[in-house]
């Protein structure tokens, strides 16, 4: 009985995540998601996200590291949006990285910007896939679970911060997403 309850709970959480993501996407698309900028410890957000995926990394023997040059500094951001960006990028990294692979997160500051990079040793993407990766409902691999809106939502949220997101990838090698945000949003 407990196993069945755990199964129902786990799948209920997945369904809730999908519904919330669809609602967020629709709100962002309609311009109904105002940005609430505050001084945020982005390093702390990344550590929290890291902690959520740590058990999964251990179970799958995925090397999972974090590197930060931010030293606890505060940066302007919408905390909820940055959490959503991080969770989507990390979720994708885990989805497409095989057991025994690696995922790294880097936080950095450069001039009047700061940002983070999520890199995995997953399946990678072809040049054609890279051109479509931020299209809504586009999925690199239809065999894996997902809605195809995560990266579209990520791009919208990054742009609400007046930032940029880039992706580099080689098939069967790696994928790397780099999010760059302004250090001053005044």
Residue ranges, per PLM feature:
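Short alpha-helical segment of the dimerization/phosphotransfer core of two-component systems
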Residues: 10-15
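Helix-loop junction within the histidine kinase core
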Residues: 26-37
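Short conserved segment of the HATPase_c
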Residues: 125-137
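A conserved beta-strand-to-alpha-helix junction within the catalytic ATP-binding
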Residues: 36-51, 83, 115
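Conserved catalytic submotifs in the C-terminal HATPase_c
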Residues: 36-41, 58, 63-73
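Short beta-strand/loop element within the Bergerat-fold HATPase_c
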Residues: 100-112
């Amino acid at each position: 009985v407990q196993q069945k309850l755990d199964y129902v709970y786990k799948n209920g959480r997945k369904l809730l995540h999908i519904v919330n993501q669809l609602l967020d996407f629709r709100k962002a698309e309609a311009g109904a998601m105002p940005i609430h900028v505050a001084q945020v410890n982005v390093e702390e957000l990344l550590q929290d996200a890291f902690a959520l995926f740590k058990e999964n990394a251990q179970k799958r023997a995925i090397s999972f590291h974090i590197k930060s040059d931010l030293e606890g500094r505060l940066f302007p951001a919408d905390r909820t949006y940055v959490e959503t960006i991080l969770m989507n990028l990390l979720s994708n990294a885990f989805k497409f990285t095989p057991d025994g692979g690696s995922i790294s997160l880097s936080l950095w500051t450069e001039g009047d910007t700061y940002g983070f990079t999520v890199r995995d040793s997953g399946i990678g993407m072809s040049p054609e896939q890279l051109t479509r990766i931020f299209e809504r409902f586009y999925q690199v691999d239809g065999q894996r679970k997902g809605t195809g809106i995560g990266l579209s939502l990520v791009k919208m949220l990054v742009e609400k911060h007046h930032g940029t997101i880039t992706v580099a990838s080689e098939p069967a090698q790696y994928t790397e997403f780099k999010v760059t945000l302004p250090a001053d949003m005044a």
